[in-house]
UniProtKB/Swiss-Prot annotation:
Its cofactor is Fe(2+). This is tRNA N6-adenosine threonylcarbamoyltransferase. It catalyses: L-threonylcarbamoyladenylate + adenosine(37) in tRNA = N(6)-L-threonylcarbamoyladenosine(37) in tRNA + AMP + H(+). Required for the formation of a threonylcarbamoyl group on adenosine at position 37 (t(6)A37) in tRNAs that read codons beginning with adenine. Is involved in the transfer of the threonylcarbamoyl moiety of threonylcarbamoyl-AMP (TC-AMP) to the N6 group of A37, together with TsaE and TsaB. TsaD likely plays a direct catalytic role in this reaction. Belongs to the KAE1 / TsaD family. It holds the Pfam family TsaD. Its EC number is 2.3.1.234. InterPro entries: ATPase_NBD (IPR043129), Gcp-like_dom (IPR000905), KAE1/TsaD (IPR017861), TsaD (IPR022450). The keyword Metal-binding applies. The gene is tsaD. It comes from Laribacter hongkongensis (strain HLHK9).
Amino acid sequence: MLVLGFESSCDETGVALYDTERGLVAHALHTQMAMHAEYGGVVPELASRDHIRRIIPLTQACLAEGGKTLADLDAIAFTQGPGLGGALLVGASVANALAFGLDIPVIDVHHLEGHLLSPMLADPAPAFPFVALLVSGGHTQLMAVHGVGQYETLGETLDDAAGEAFDKTAKLLGLPYPGGPLLSRLAESGDPARFTLPRPMLNSADLDMSFSGLKTAVLTLKTRVEADLGPIDEQTRADICRAFQESIVEVLVKKSLGALKRTGLKRLVVAGGVGANRQLRAALDAACARRRVEVFYPPLSLCTDNGAMIALAGAMRLKQAHAAGSFSIKPRWDLSSLPPVNGAA
């Protein structure tokens, strides 16, 4: 079965082909980062309009890369939510229009389920059950995943997501949008011994996290350094970035290990854009190796939003496919409301 997947929940337009026998056939992606940089963040109206401009050319490019035509498709999957309403409507409209014209079914996909399942696009792929660390700009959660649609929340951030904290702290330090990846790169040249920042909720009995206070801690540190030394230079900025990243990484690693211990599981899956962070990967790899835990990541190119994860999730939910026509979007959508799937593709 060949599934075409559309992702348009925020500021990436993604299209992909997934074959239930062969795996990922092709994928195409356009990011709007440069367009939104002028405004210092995502502008929903501009995001929606850019999805409209990009989605058909990307679909054509994806089909050409895979050597397929529309007539080869068996189903179409699209991100139904959560996300920006206008952006979601673009993917939903195109998916349903194509499916209606081709007389093939559509599959509504939860964006976060796409992220949770995305490491299955790697080789080797994880087997169920596993603990998942979902860490992105909008979400930071630890979940026990027993199968498709079988998700138990073990812990989550009580305020800012880790990726959101990266972006906000980067802006505070004068880095251009999108600042999170720039902060991570700058941290690599920072001195880990120069500054220390708090590790919020590191030793709490639960598996919840909190990152909003780190921004205040960074601002306090920056203000103190500027009072003592004047405007911060590039090395000092890198040292502050390193201290910030060390704090986030230590919390994520300790909470992940706590989730593994609580569940007794021996597989950890890391998904979401922050999952591409090299220091986080290195720390998780080392900690899991000491405990004989397998750790899995999506390919680096598929850590951020993409159509491949939506096509995969759609393929694994083929039994929920339905006729095209009337459709809805869900800008807010609780992952726990998804039905379980038995015998997924």
